[in-house]
Amino acid sequence: MIEENKHFEKKMQEYDASQIQVLEGLEAVRMRPGMYIGSTAKEGLHHLVWEIVDNSIDEALAGFASHIKVFIEADNSITVVDDGRGIPVDIQAKTGRPAVETVFTVLHAGGKFGGGGYKVSGGLHGVGSSVVNALSTQLDVRVYKNGQIHYQEFKRGAVVADLEIIGTTDVTGTTVHFTPDPEIFTETTQFDYSVLAKRIQELAFLNRGLKISITDKRSGMEQEEHFHYEGGIGSYVEFLNDKKDVIFETPIYTDGELEGIAVEVAMQYTTSYQETVMSFANNIHTHEGGTHEQGFRAALTRVINDYAKKNKILKENEDNLTGEDVREGLTAVISVKHPNPQFEGQTKTKLGNSEVVKITNRLFSEAFQRFLLENPQVARKIVEKGILASKARIAAKRAREVTRKKSGLEISNLPGKLADCSSNDANQNELFIVEGDSAGGSAKSGRNREFQAILPIRGKILNVEKATMDKILANEEIRSLFTAMGTGFGADFDVSKARYQKLVIMTDADVDGAHIRTLLLTLIYRFMRPVLEAGYVYIAQPPIYGVKVGSEIKEYIQPGIDQEDQLKTALEKYSIGRSKPTVQRYKGLGEMDDHQLWETTMDPENRLMARVTVDDAAEADKVFDMLMGDRVEPRRDFIEENAVYSTLDI
């Protein structure tokens, strides 16, 4: 025992300064890249591009750049070109090195700190250039400034050679070229053109008049897009409403500046029942909203009510319209430019500056009041839409109260057809929404009763894209789902109260099954989106074929692009000697017994499930409206354009 204590004492004495590791320069970034770019997966890889593009956008925000070009090179490296002033090349006092070298080799170096470089910056932390350098096998920068072309190259963050002049020029700007390091990005170093193009288009909308393009030079993937919107966020609203019926043609656009904070709002009403409000702060999409949205919402509600009362559209003794009423069918984009944005929330995408509430409120109120006075016909349409929404809300409230009395939107009154699980651990619990009573019966028998619950639904549920709130709440199947999930509804919705953290849609592998799946996804997207954003929603992948030898099923074939190849391979595999394999086609879940359903579709050890995510809310909104909304023409166009890829289930 004494010997052990002596040994312990010796170990303690050895813990001295020599044991402390100091990470020099950009070594810390390479050691812990996730701290700087979020992850080393696909999202983090694309974040490298945004760090460099954001620097060019900063030049545009400051009024010095008008054209940005992004290239995915043939070798999958990235080049970003802008026509700004060019990164400074003179000696930086603190480091004694050229400023451009400092920007790419020293963390927190750049024109974004201290207010001397940029009035407003798109960057969250100003470490972008050096982080990209640290996480690239090679990076080079060309600065076009003062009639000269300055060039410097780096490898994994380290300087290869001093800054040099390699030519003359009559233009200004900066060109950055980098190759992501596969030692860091072990999952993939392949850039996704569509991911880059969507964000680049968004930046073009948010920066009126800016020209920004993306070009893919990779073999077999060559494509190019140019974005330029003189209408700015007004054009963005038109883009979002492209497939919708609008109640007035030209979006309302307002802009203003107060206390150094610039506010832009564009909005337009549609005939739909859904609200689409997107907000941005310094070009960063604030998915979680924030103080700019608060100010906008409060002003919108107050101004519409004031106008309605003053013009006798609403009587003095009538209740005011609520925020929910005046936002029904609204599509709006809010963009603020703030010299010192504060971001908070779970994903740091919520604007927290308290002063922005009153500034947005005041600037938007003044402009919106003026618009309503100058456009009385449009103003009346807006108010009347709000009044209709109010009537539907009151009817929905009555329906909700009746529903609570009859079957309850309360957890204590779970729907009768729900076969619940015994576990109370939401983290492991799974709710399967199953098409039809027959399959529901098999699923109930075959499941693991400890953590798997079954909710059968009959037929096609209501298309919520075309329905008012009172009709939605009157639908028994929809009510059952909300009650089973335990999350509440509407303003009371709380994803933290979800009783299951896997919500699995399990429908037949035919056209009807696909339709039911789409209806359920529409419902979840419109009224349970936090469940979707939390990653709780899955689609079961039941087999489409079973390969039998005699009476025994040897292999199941899952649906997918290569399903016919899988089937062909399986048939060849089991065509041995005299045995002749046969194919069983599963059109419905009810064609499988409980054991088969468990083995192929529900057993966590064997099953395949597709998780449903929302990477692009604006695009998702447009697609749901096109597929499920009132307008037939966009849906017909989509079917005609994509029919060649469809499989008919006859």
Curated annotation (Swiss-Prot):
Q: What is its EC number?
A: 5.6.2.2
Needed cofactors? Mg(2+); Mn(2+); Ca(2+)
Q: Which CDD domains match?
A: HATPase_GyrB-like (cd16928), TopoII_Trans_DNA_gyrase (cd00822), TOPRIM_TopoIIA_GyrB (cd03366)
* Top-level EC class as recorded in UniProt: isomerase
The UniProt entry lists the main location of this chain as cytoplasm
> Where does the chain bind Mg(2+) 1?
435, 508
Q: Where does Mg(2+) 2 bind?
A: 508, 510
Which keywords accompany this UniProt record? ATP-binding, Cytoplasm, DNA-binding, Isomerase, Magnesium, Metal-binding, Nucleotide-binding, Topoisomerase
Limits of the Toprim domain: 429-543
Further remarks about this protein from its record: Few gyrases are as efficient as E.coli at forming negative supercoils. Not all organisms have 2 type II topoisomerases; in organisms with a single type II topoisomerase this enzyme also has to decatenate newly replicated chromosomes.
Tell me the HAMAP family matching this sequence. Answer: GyrB
Name-wise, this protein is DNA gyrase subunit B
Query: What species was this sequence derived from?
Result: Streptococcus pyogenes serotype M6 (strain ATCC BAA-946 / MGAS10394)
Q: Point out the gene that encodes the protein.
A: gyrB
